[in-house]
Amino acid sequence: YHIDGFRFDLTKGFTQAASTESSASNYDKSRIEILKDYHAAIKEVKPEAYVILEHFCDSKEEKELAEDGMHLWRNMNNAYCQTAMGWNDDSAFDGLYESIPAWIGFMESHDEERAAYKQTQWGDEALKTDLTTRMRQLEVNASFFFTVPGPKMIWQFGEMGYDVSIEENGRTG
């Protein structure tokens, strides 16, 4: 096997501080130190390894982790779903153009509903009912997604029209 790096899921849970659902995303210096220690240990063994975090915490905390060389997920699901459905509200992609070059943007994931499915449920006019129109809109979405600078996470071909809900037959559709 050739391992390029490691992805850590739900890293806001990597803490020794007590927290609740509402406070887990607050700035936590101890969590930063734990993740920096893991990062250093990985780099000691393989200096070119990627370390990717599903973090979703305070922006100051994410900035510190990025400055240490780690990459962080950047959830753009809502914006891409809004454009896929033909809606302008909340459809800006500017979250991927922030000053932190360590963002790994994504349109969909195992935690987020698929854009093509949302088109069939809440799409504007023909986007809801016409497959050809939906696919053309998803092509435009993919064009924006793939041309934004930086790395991308692609998950189960949502950009190609996977229109089954993630809730069908359990969490993975």
Predicted regions and their residues:
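Active-site-proximal helices and loops of the catalytic beta/alpha 8
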Residues: 10-112, 120-124, 133-136, 143-147, ...
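Active-site-adjacent loop/helix micro-motif of nuclease/hydrolase catalytic cores
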Residues: 116
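An active-site-proximal structural segment forming one wall of the substrate-binding cleft
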Residues: 1-7
